[in-house]
Amino acid sequence: MFRLRSISLLSWRAFPLRPFSCESLITQMQKCTNEEQVFDLIETNTATLSEQQVGCAFNVLWQFQKQKTVLEKNVDHVRNHPQFLTLCSITTNHIPAMSDATLVDVLYSIKQFAVESHHPLIEALVTEAWKRLERFDTNVLSIFSTCLADQHLYFSPLMGKIADIVNRRLETIQDLRALSVLMVSISSLISPCFQERLVIRTELLFDTVNSSKVNIARRILLFLRNVKYSHYPLLERCNQVFIRNMSHLDLESISKILNLYQFLQFHSFEFVEAARGRLAEMTLPSDHPESFVRLFAALGPVARPEIKKQLKSTILLLSEELSSQQALIVLGAMEDMESRNSHLLKKIVSVLYKHLDNYKSIELLKIIQALTFLHFQSKELFMKLRELLLSRLEASVIPSEISVLVSALSMLPHPHLSETAVSRIEAVLPQCDFRELNDLVVYLMRWIQSDLVCLASTTGKQLDLLQKLDQLGRHRLQQSTNLDLLWEELKSLKGEWLHESLVEESIAALLRFMDEIDYSNIAKVASFLSRTNYLNTLLLDRIASVAIQQVEKIHPFSVLAIILPFSILNYDPPQKDEFFGACVQCCNSYLGTLDPGTLVFLGFSLAVLEYFPEDLLKKMFNIEFLARLDSQLEILPSSLSARIQFRLMELNRAVCLECPELQVPWFHDRFCQRQFNKDTGVMNGAQQQIYKMLAEVLGGHQCVKPSALSPYYHTVGFECILDKRKKPLPYESHSIAPRKSLGMHWDSRVEPRLPPEAERIAIELLDVRAFCSNIPHLKGKSAMKKRHLEILGYRVIQIPYFEWNSMAMSTKDARMDYLREHLFGEGKS
């Protein structure tokens, strides 16, 4: 009897009776309609909850939050609820018995409620997960990596262990959703080789993904942003997923995608056009500033004029309710919109002014950049900004922040660099990366040029600092050990520092690693050469050779960058036709995908090189393409839109003059008249000097026309006409009469009649911009202009600046003889 009683007591302790079975309690939790019902069940069953039940409870609580709007979420209320705290306490005891999936799901759910990372439950869950790491399947591993990322453990040994597991298992991973999560989490720890393997695996798995999986595509973009890699094939495929699912994208998703595209410098007119339509459909309550500010930032820069007006009117009404961050977002959007609405700008600035002390240094720089671009002036605001920036500069020891502060200070009126500031900069130089060094050089140059008042006290030290920066820059370039590391330095080089101090060292460094140039980096090297204005035929020949040999691996989006240095520097590689043909062939299947503006730039670059692919030109010069281009121009910044329109005109002119057999019509008369009527025709000192000398040589001002326009609107520095005996003809004596202002002197396509055997002469003074920086080699646009003028019947005399300003031509007589020689073929009249 006693034995039976003891067995009965043991059974009671081991298997206590529960009000509901495990399954029935889970079912009840899943049927709950709000958090309070879940908490009631937890309170009722506290003593009997199993590991499956606590896992279900956390999951159900999180699902409720996911279903709520931003305004409805009550994370704080749930986290601080007594039964939530009880649930956390109970869960700690069940951790060893949990399955891998339950363990990680509980950790994930708890993190969504913003529980502190040092909470005992989170520490216990992470510790247990670490022990089991090797046995986690890919899905569980991906969720766990997200939990670590939420705790900012990107560089932790635990994240490193996850990266190692992914590296070992990569070829067997079949789930792109899980892989995309892992890629984002471990992106800070991967090598270039591992990065390339991840990209290749992602491409292989992409076709297995349901096209509606927007989140997977967005995570792939996040990964590419984190590793700073604009991999066009993946970007393009993600872009198609977004476009197909545009009707399901909300404001937040579109905003994030646009920001990622901007960072990756990926331009998709098709996506922007679809997003513009989707955003315009959204009706948001004007009494909810957070959502409306997001809409203003996303839609404003690409909206049609009437929509922009509505957006600005509404944001003006909300301006006094904006937080510091919302005001910053609105200012950035106004910069993108090029909106100088003074009333709205003053309202936004008043909000910014209240919060200046709370902004990060990089945010202060953005504020100053935007206000400068929008031409906003406020002495009080700029004085406060200056004081704030100087105080931070004198206290900071972080190189990146010092670079930002110096940049911001130099953009303010009357910049002045104190001794303390110079010393602070000097102290951190060895720790600066190349981008920071370049920024310091740019802004030190600005200081030296503008700081006239304090020249005696500061310039000496500033010049010494510039010299140290030059030496450090050269040393960094010389120390690079491979092309990838060199590119990390070169991509930040720009402006005066590149052209005046480091161009020779940069080219020499590229030549050291010339054999490493391949399809993966060819566009980067070419884009850098385009910026240098430096002609190195060895590098350009290598680029052409790689393009021909590896054309099937080159993405069409890279072709413009590859062609550009050849076009700018006016260089034909030995395999010219094969090279240009390979580049054009690479683009042919993408002509419907490439942005209209990109095609215009590509067509023009090829035209400069006297290469006119018929398929490309037929694609561009038709009504459908031009309509798409007009739509794109509406949403682009005005400066870029103007550049594209001007390049289209130049391409149209080149095709009409050099390929008349294509029968492309000339349709830019009105555009050119608007453009050139804006030009006042004011001559600089050198031009005035030549004008006077030409008048003397030709027998009077009536025989020379300054700032003339040719047919098809080429601007000619000076024009004159010689008869068959090389006698100058005054303009009053024939059909061309001089005008008071610049404009058309004849129909743009019909050359005025000249006397028999007379010749029209174009005289051009070519400044330093017309030549390569290292040799007197004429650049592409100047060579094209000469070609066109000769087709139009001109004899072209180009006067290089280095000849005109040489010692041999230092006297007026020498220059007069030079002009006579070129005009009449004789040294003296």
Swiss-Prot record:
It is found in: Mitochondrion. Its main location: mitochondrion. The keyword Transferase does not apply. SMART domains: RAP. The keyword Acetylation applies. Pfam families: FAST_1 (PF06743), FAST_2 (PF08368), RAP (PF08373). Keywords: Acetylation, Mitochondrion, Transit peptide. GO terms for biological process: mitochondrial RNA metabolic process; regulation of mitochondrial mRNA stability. One of its GO terms (cellular component) is nucleoplasm. Expression detected in spleen, testis, colon, heart, smooth muscle, kidney, brain, lung, liver, brown and white adipose tissue with highest expression in heart and brown adipose tissue. The modification N6-acetyllysine is found at residue 346. Residues 761-821 form the RAP domain. The RAP domain is essential to regulate MT-ND3 mRNA levels. Belongs to the FAST kinase family. Involved in the down-regulation of mitochondrial MT-ND3 mRNA levels which leads to decreased respiratory complex I abundance and activity. This is FAST kinase domain-containing protein 1, mitochondrial. The lineage of its organism: Eukaryota, Metazoa, Chordata, Craniata, Vertebrata.
